[in-house]
């Protein structure tokens, strides 16, 4: 995953370096739902923004607003960037059900391999099949997280039967259907709401990848963690790094 983030930092900055002329300093507002310590912000967006500033000779500055600091909820990020409320966002495609139907294919269970391999496949898929889903945006990058795991407050999950009747959080409609198929009672919500739901007993557990756990302190609220054996993981979700199309074309 770290290798792929370094690749994104290098490749995404090229999009800005290809622009030939600027009229003074341009300030771009970046908005996302994870807190600043999350890998997506600290190890991707922050170094990327610094690289953009340096290689544009100080003419393009990216202001980073993590944790929904500019208002709204995570599912609204795609509308915020499309409508020009902000200039750039990082979000989960499946937080807006039905908006990106082609991309939901990558949420199907037991599909993902590593984050790197699945992300490369997603990029090719977007370039060749799913471009219509993202026609209203300037796509800076698309990628997937490492295969998601099952995390529960107390109960150890050793088989699908152990999930029967458990209230389990899923991030998207495809993954909540998967949880329902496994016998759980699915509860859909973005990841920033998970800690509160665990603390209040709204859910018994959730599915998330390992790398997001520390950012939201979810490891402090769960005791049991279950992985899926084999070469394929349980699931993944596509991430979108998008820019307002008109803003990009104005540079």
Regions of interest found by a model, annotated:
Residues 1-2, 16, 141:
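Short intrinsically disordered, low-complexity coil segments enriched in acidic
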Residues 16-23:
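Sec/Tat signal peptide C-region and signal peptidase I cleavage site
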Residues 24-116, 128, 132-251:
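N-terminal secretory/targeting leader peptides
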